[in-house]
Design a protein with these regions (language model features):
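Flexible glycine-/small-residue-rich
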Residues: 39-42, 74, 92, 129
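C-terminal terminal-structure detector
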Residues: 85, 99, 106-148
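Residue-level detector of functionally special positions within alpha-helical transmembrane segments
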Residues: 2-4, 73, 120
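A hydrophobic, helix-centered structural microdomain
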Residues: 1-46, 82
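Glutamine-centric residue-chemistry signal
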Residues: 25, 79, 126-128
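Acidic, Ser/Thr-rich low-complexity segments on the non-lumenal side of membrane proteins
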Residues: 35-67
Length: 148
């Protein structure tokens, strides 16, 4: 059912800029175990050559097709493979990178409890809050997950 959309998105990524179609990144999952998350690449290659940086609506690292994909969440579709691999579920807290988890825990130590469940493609926090562009917004989104 999703095959035509996946093929269309992959073709548009390939035509929009140089680089791989899929983007993979280490995230922290269930019980603090690292795993590779898959997404359609929405940014130009070497977007994080200066270190980890969260994206925002004004982010110039995003490709024109990447802007559209992120608005429609099409870039997240390859995460269904993460669900099939058992790394993620459909619904659960969004998985983050260790770099950001370390910062979040300094302000919100209870964040470690998020790793007691499998991370998800979507969550109540994503529905209510959307993407986070800084650590403070990540903490606010987490509060929607934990109902704090």
């Amino acid at each position: 059912l999703l095959t035509p959309l996946l093929l269309y998105a992959a073709l548009k990524v390939r035509l929009s800029s140089n680089g791989p179609i899929l983007y993979k990144q280490e995230r922290i999952g269930l019980n603090g175990k690292p795993f590779l998350i898959y997404k359609f690449r929405s940014m130009y290659i070497d977007a994080e050559k200066n270190g980890p940086t969260l994206s925002s609506d004004e982010d110039e690292r995003r490709t024109p097709w990447g802007i559209i994909m992120r608005k429609m969440r099409i870039d997240e579709l390859p995460q269904f493979f993460n669900v099939l691999f058992g790394d993620m579920s459909l619904v659960g807290p969004r998985p983050e990178r260790k770099f950001y988890i370390d910062q979040i825990v300094m302000s919100a130590p209870h964040y470690v409890h998020v790793h007691r469940v499998r991370p998800g493609i979507t969550s109540w926090g994503m529905v209510q809050f959307g993407y986070a562009s800084n650590v403070e917004e990540m903490i606010k989104r987490m509060k929607w997950i934990c109902f704090m």
